[in-house]
Curated annotation (Swiss-Prot):
Residues passing through the membrane, by range: 55-75, 213-233
Single Gene Ontology MF annotation: transmembrane signaling receptor activity
Name of the molecule in the record: Transmembrane domain-containing protein TMIGD3
InterPro entries in UniProt: CD300_family_receptors, Ig-like_dom_sf, Ig-like_fold
Keywords noted in UniProt: Glycoprotein, Membrane, Transmembrane, Transmembrane helix
Reported tissue expression: Expressed in the lung and bone. Expressed at lower levels in osteosarcoma tissues (at protein level).
Gene: TMIGD3
Gene Ontology CC: membrane; plasma membrane
Length: 266
């Protein structure tokens, strides 16, 4: 009836309808058909949706950071390289362009954490030349010796992570014919022939010192042999003189007149 006061049931249904109209549209998917008519609001569903919205960006950020830390930013072209004495050796270290402005280096050692850094890019030495192209670090070693045989690493310095590194093993031999790779045929990466490699001054000084020491040892050995031979010859001569002296002593004794008389009577 119009104008009659609403009963308890009518008031309860009116409250449900008003609370249902106040719910936002994005909560409709969280409510089951039964709950849409029985429960005016579900704070737990709203909270779970908010947690999902906040968790997704954090999860994606964690995945990106993990990929950045775990992925190989530096990759060596070959794990084993061969060359020969007084020739050049080159290595190409490919890296992600993201690390273009990061310092790169070339180091030597079996363990990556204890390798000795030889040179930083773009600096070079008389023995090692580094060239950074933006996505490759090209290392060229010249005037190789057998002492250069060992393990080498390309490295990228990173501020908030461990340095990314990759290794190669260099084997230097004397025989040029044993090389099977044209990459080590005495040409650099640009195709030009490398300059003739001469032994460094330090090596020359070492060779001269070795030869001088060898000559001194030979002279000392010769003098020792000569002195021993002369000593033996003198000893033999003295022994011969003693033997001759002992044989001549009985005949060199002077005879007295009494001893000479019997000999004359005979």
């Amino acid at each position: 009836m119009e104008g009659s006061p609403a009963g308890p049931i009518e008031q309860k249904e009116a409250r449900w309808e008003s609370s249902w109209e106040e719910q936002p549209d994005w909560t409709l998917g969280c409510l089951s058909p039964e709950s849409q008519f029985r429960i005016p609001g579900l704070p737990g569903c709203i909270l779970s949706f908010q947690l999902k919205v906040c968790f997704l960006p954090v999860m994606w950020l964690f995945i990106l950071l993990s990929l950045a830390l775990i992925s190989d930013a530096m990759v060596m072209d070959e794990k084993v390289k061969r060359s020969f004495v007084l020739d050049t050796a080159s290595a190409i270290c490919n890296y992600n362009a993201h690390y273009k402005n990061h310092p790169k280096y070339w180091c030597r050692g079996y363990f990556r954490d204890y390798c000795n850094i030889i040179a930083f890019s773009p600096n070079s030495t008389n023995h090692v030349a580094l060239r950074d192209t933006g996505n490759q670090l090209i290392v060229t070693m010249s005037c190789l010796t057998k002492e250069d045989t060992g393990w080498y690493w390309c490295g990228i310095q990173r501020d908030f992570a461990r340095d990314d590194m990759d290794f190669t093993e260099l084997i230097v031999t004397d025989d040029k014919g044993t090389l099977a790779n044209d990459f080590w045929s005495g040409k650099d990466l640009s195709g030009n022939k490398t300059r003739s490699c001469k032994a460094p001054k330090v090596v020359r000084k070492a060779d001269r010192s070795r030869t001088s020491i060898l000559i001194i040892c030979i002279l000392i050995t010769g003098l020792g042999i000569i002195s021993v031979i002369s000593h033996l010859t003198k000893r033999r001569r003295s022994q011969r003189n003693r033997r001759v002296g002992n044989t001549l002593k009985p005949f060199s004794r002077v005879l007295t007149p009494k001893e000479m008389a019997p000999t004359e009577q005979m």
